């Protein structure tokens, strides 16, 4: 990937982008083999690769500069504001909207928040784009309600210029610390969610719900998990850490009932709405802690799918899974290091199949899907 920001050493987030993408994939595959299955008889499937540019559906921009010259991007290594509105990770429609927003913020006279002086209002711009519809969800993260009047007054101009903006909200984050968002979300549009679609499965995205940032690869991840589950054909399964229900919605079938568990109520609301849109009646969701849910169960279904955050399952949940003894565990991980640690604690299981998905090109990160079978 040709990136001027990287060449100038002003942004090094994509620290591998100087390497040809094919070489990145080869190196990552070798590293993951050595980490996950160095001496095991495991079916290692070819990786699912990504486009090397224009693959992200979400931008998180710090609002820098001053009201008369706002900048959306980051601070570089020297502490200087760097506009990233033309970052090659973003599709052209996102780049165009981000560039327009820089000028729109200036015209609206909204002062960026200055973390050193603890003055100003606008902290972040969070932009999400539906790959399926091309529509946007735009969130302004502000220090206080003082910014609302200027945003509302100038919003018609913004939406007239970009009618694909479907959802607009203001998130209030009053704390002076490195926190992306606060508790209060104020919607400025009637529509409060964005609709995505993977493999003919509708996915509802709300402001605070986690959603994969590489939709083309995520679609293949969900399709692969569905295919593996259908090979097993369980009558019941759990989807722990289910988020907005991507795996559960794909895996539910007339003969497979799925229970999705996620601690974030907003994500569960999204998952439930998707299930209603699909007309699925053997799919249920609950806003619960996955470990506490497992602890409350006397037995497990034939298959448990887990998709934990970067910290992994943790000893409490791995111990519960050992005791509940499902025949299969399907583990999707964004952190292979913690996944390997968790699998070591699942002593009654052995890896049967592994495939990784390059959700994060130009970095060391990968999404890994592993099928574990009880010995």
Swiss-Prot record:
S-adenosyl-L-methionine binds at residues 212, 241, 262, 307. Its EC number is 2.1.1.189. CDD domains: AdoMet_MTases. It catalyses: uridine(747) in 23S rRNA + S-adenosyl-L-methionine = 5-methyluridine(747) in 23S rRNA + S-adenosyl-L-homocysteine + H(+). PANTHER family: RNA M5U METHYLTRANSFERASE, TRNA (URACIL(54)-C(5))-METHYLTRANSFERASE. This is 23S rRNA (uracil(747)-C(5))-methyltransferase RlmC. GO terms for biological process: rRNA base methylation. Gene3D superfamilies: 2.40.50.1070, Vaccinia Virus protein VP39 (3.40.50.150). Keywords: 4Fe-4S, Iron, Iron-sulfur, Metal-binding, Methyltransferase, rRNA processing, S-adenosyl-L-methionine, Transferase. The active site is at residue 334. InterPro entries: 23SrRNA_MeTrfase_RlmC, MeTrfase_TrmA_AS, SAM-dependent_MTases_sf, U5_MeTrfase_fam. Catalyzes the formation of 5-methyl-uridine at position 747 (m5U747) in 23S rRNA.
